[in-house]
Amino acid sequence: MTKYETVIGLEVHVQLDTKSKMFCRCSTDYASAEPNTHVCPVCLGMPGVLPTINKQAVEYTIMSGLALGCDIAPFTKFDRKNYAYPDLMKGYQISQYDQPLCGKGFLDINVDGVIRRIGITRIHLEEDVAKLHHESDINGQPYSLLDINRSSIPLMEVVSEPDMRTPEEARQYLMKLRTIMRYLGVSTANMEEGSFRCDANISIRPVGATELGAKVEVKNMNSFKAVFSALEYEEVRQRKMADEGKKISQETRGWQDEKCQTVSQRSKEFAHDYRYFPEPDLPPLHISCDWIEDIRAKLPELPETRKERFINGYWLSEYDASLLTASRELADYFEAVLGETDFQNIPQDKGVKEVANWVVGSVNSIMNTGGADITAFALKVSPASLCHLLVLVSAGKVNAATAKAVLEDMYATGQNAEAIIEKKGLSQISDSSELVAIAKKVLADNPKAVAEYNEGKTQVIGFLVGQMMKQSKGRANPNIAMELLKKALEEG
């Protein structure tokens, strides 16, 4: 049994998906723009200019706070965070220090079937910094270029309590938080693109102790896997140092993905190192109860609530419901297909399960193979088109295996199912006379399997059905094929 307990807290920076920057009207579409084109005197930090607060960013932060059960402050203000770094255009960052927009909240995560409640310390608003590009000249000498397009993009920082005890809990927390941000529509929350960034604070202490150990901040993690690996590495490193009687320094370390290790970058700063003071160019904000309730009324159904509805209302398993609600767009697509479905000829629970199987299985498989999301998929295969394909399967016009290939063609070409089936001659063969001829040939070609069946090894019927499917190029109705084979074998 381990002597140490790991303590992890996360600071997550979420780029808000607003059209303009936090304190000016410059566009936030910096990713596809030429460097240093979406700039103005305000985000350049020129003397004498005055910032103005982006109302949409404030509303997005309140919305996020409500979704995470936070207390929304009736009074909040901005502060100057002072530090020297080349990507900080003003020489300070406009942030929030002692009076953040959102206070205490929580996020529940499920790890191996156990629900863990992770506390949220605060959520505050600030501006992003410019982006440094590190290059080398023809002689191998390093130099850096500065792209100011990202400077002053609205940034929301979600700070957790140090409530996580394993790297896996940290990963689950991040994944759940990202899903909520995407459901709310406040951010694309893409780690690889930098719109969802995480710094982790990790320490160890003897099991049973209540006082926190020396805190190490880990940076430069741009994927969920990197966060997990960095924390796992740091956990092992710190425990080894403690076992060897070495002092663990409070410092900032960077994750090196290619070497799978953390390296020391600098000593960890304290709040007083930043010399915070109130931002003199921005008035405090008074958040009225009416404003909060207006925003609350706009909240969408959140993933956990939607998952419970799918389980209780659609009779889905927790596994299927979790997969379907992992993305708001995927859940919307699933419900849109259901809305097109006529359950008159089949039990509703069976029909819902069939739709869920197709969306979770075949649709997800096509998206993963093609690197597309459900929005792109729906442009080629609308909910009505998928529903029509399932109707053809239910009516026996095409079998399930062939239908999966048809769905792939529908996505590739944008054509409807019937056109593809007719063009490629994929209609299911349900005519008994035609299938009897195929069955006779299969039995004649496989005397060993016939002998095994007659000896009581009835499981070989599956092999024989497979041979009929092969002979018919996947068009044989598998249920009728099995009946005909059994009848022929019983009759000898």
Curated annotation (Swiss-Prot):
GO-annotated biological processes: glutaminyl-tRNAGln biosynthesis via transamidation; translation
Enzymatic reactions: L-glutamyl-tRNA(Gln) + L-glutamine + ATP + H2O = L-glutaminyl-tRNA(Gln) + L-glutamate + ADP + phosphate + H(+); L-aspartyl-tRNA(Asn) + L-glutamine + ATP + H2O = L-asparaginyl-tRNA(Asn) + L-glutamate + ADP + phosphate + 2 H(+)
InterPro entries to which the protein is assigned, alphabetical: Asn/Gln-tRNA_amidoTrfase_suB/E, Asn/Gln-tRNA_Trfase_suB/E_cat, Asn/Gln_amidotransferase, Asn/Gln_tRNA_amidoTrase-B-like, GatB, GatB_C_1, GatB_Yqey_C_2, Gln-tRNA_amidoTrfase_suB_CS
EC numbers for this chain: 6.3.5.-
Cystines in this chain: none
Keywords of this entry: ATP-binding, Ligase, Nucleotide-binding, Protein biosynthesis
TM region(s), chain numbering: none
GO molecular function: asparaginyl-tRNA synthase (glutamine-hydrolyzing) activity; ATP binding; glutaminyl-tRNA synthase (glutamine-hydrolyzing) activity
SUPFAM superfamilies with a match to the protein in the record: GatB/YqeY motif, Glutamine synthetase/guanido kinase
SUBUNIT field: Heterotrimer of A, B and C subunits.
Function as written in the Swiss-Prot or TrEMBL entry: Allows the formation of correctly charged Asn-tRNA(Asn) or Gln-tRNA(Gln) through the transamidation of misacylated Asp-tRNA(Asn) or Glu-tRNA(Gln) in organisms which lack either or both of asparaginyl-tRNA or glutaminyl-tRNA synthetases. The reaction takes place in the presence of glutamine and ATP through an activated phospho-Asp-tRNA(Asn) or phospho-Glu-tRNA(Gln).
UniProt family annotation: Belongs to the GatB/GatE family. GatB subfamily.
Listed HAMAP family: GatB (MF_00121)
Protein name per UniProt: Aspartyl/glutamyl-tRNA(Asn/Gln) amidotransferase subunit B
Organism per entry: Dehalococcoides mccartyi (strain CBDB1)
Classification lineage: Bacteria, Bacillati, Chloroflexota, Dehalococcoidia, Dehalococcoidales
Gene: gatB
